[in-house]
């Protein structure tokens, strides 16, 4: 009888562990031409301490020195040694990079999908506890308004969908980064959600918005610019654009066991009351003056985050 109880207990523990869940925080953040210079590190440290994300999908790294600086002096500050970086492709003036919690993920591969003005970076990660493979497409699309720039953005999304339509419902993936999209009417934005020839590969946006993002009714989703004055090469003009995105595969949007938490999508520091204002204009109802100043001085973008259950 006692032996049978031990066997039953073992099976219950094994069953429970096989269905254990892990909540992962994913953040996309444009770092504004970040390099080996440490002048802005103090500001980024405050932002990162507040976020404490498991994965950072970043844009505008100027060089490999910038990757090392962000990894060693900001993410792994005080010799924490929690994060690793993916292989860095130094191909343009500014490039994308990925940083991840080595205790939660193993990097399987890094590759690029050719694009204009820069490639899409694809990272394949394995979630250690569940062994599920997670695909991240890190993108920094062509900036500026105008039909020619819209066409270049749309062409790059076509290249992305050519890849993702080869996937199926067993693939978990997101597209994140600085999309530089001004409106839901843009061809690039619409292409994310069109049905493909295979029936797979489209994306989902948790944000419910229609038309131009430069509108006070969408103030709470704006990510650029947290500044009204121009300095350090960044954009000014106050918060009035949604340029930074995280989009989700059907498997994450409608998943039962692996999915993202819909009410977790957030723009750090944006309380919805700073349309065309600097993020550190007080009052700010969601962050302190110190953190608002750090967000203001670190970059001309605000970080976007979401939680995913594995």
Predicted regions and their residues:
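Sec-dependent N-terminal signal peptides
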Residues: 4-14
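Sec/Tat signal peptide C-region and signal peptidase I cleavage site
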Residues: 16-20
């Amino acid at each position: 009888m006692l032996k049978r109880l031990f066997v039953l207990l073992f099976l219950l523990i094994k069953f429970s562990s096989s269905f254990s869940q892990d909540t992962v925080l994913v953040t996309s953040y444009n770092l504004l031409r970040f390099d080996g210079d440490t002048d802005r590190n103090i500001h980024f440290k405050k932002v990162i301490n507040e976020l404490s994300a498991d994965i950072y999908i970043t844009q505008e790294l100027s060089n490999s020195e910038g990757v090392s600086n962000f990894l060693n002096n900001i993410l792994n500050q005080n010799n924490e040694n929690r994060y690793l970086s993916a292989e860095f492709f130094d191909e343009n003036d500014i490039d994308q990079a990925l940083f991840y919690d080595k205790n939660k993920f193993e990097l399987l591969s890094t590759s690029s999908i050719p694009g204009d003005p820069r490639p899409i970076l694809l990272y394949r990660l394995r979630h250690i506890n569940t062994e599920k493979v997670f695909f991240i497409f890190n993108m920094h699309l062509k900036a500026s308004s105008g039909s020619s720039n819209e066409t270049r953005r749309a062409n790059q999304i076509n290249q992305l969908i050519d890849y993702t339509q080869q996937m199926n419902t067993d693939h978990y993936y997101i597209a994140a980064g600085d999309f530089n999209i001004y409106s839901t009417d843009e061809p690039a934005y619409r292409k994310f959600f069109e049905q493909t020839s295979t029936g797979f590969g489209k994306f989902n946006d948790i944000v419910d918005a229609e038309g131009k993002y430069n509108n006070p009714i969408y103030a709470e989703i704006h990510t650029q610019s947290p500044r009204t004055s121009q300095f350090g090469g960044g954009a000014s003009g106050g918060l009035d654009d949604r340029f930074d995105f995280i989009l989700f595969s059907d498997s994450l949007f409608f998943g039962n066991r692996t999915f993202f938490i819909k009410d977790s999508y957030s723009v750090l520091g944006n309380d919805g009351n700073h349309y065309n204002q600097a993020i550190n204009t007080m009052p700010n109802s969601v962050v302190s003056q110190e953190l608002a100043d750090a967000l203001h001085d670190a970059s001309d973008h605000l970080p976007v985050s979401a939680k995913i259950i594995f």
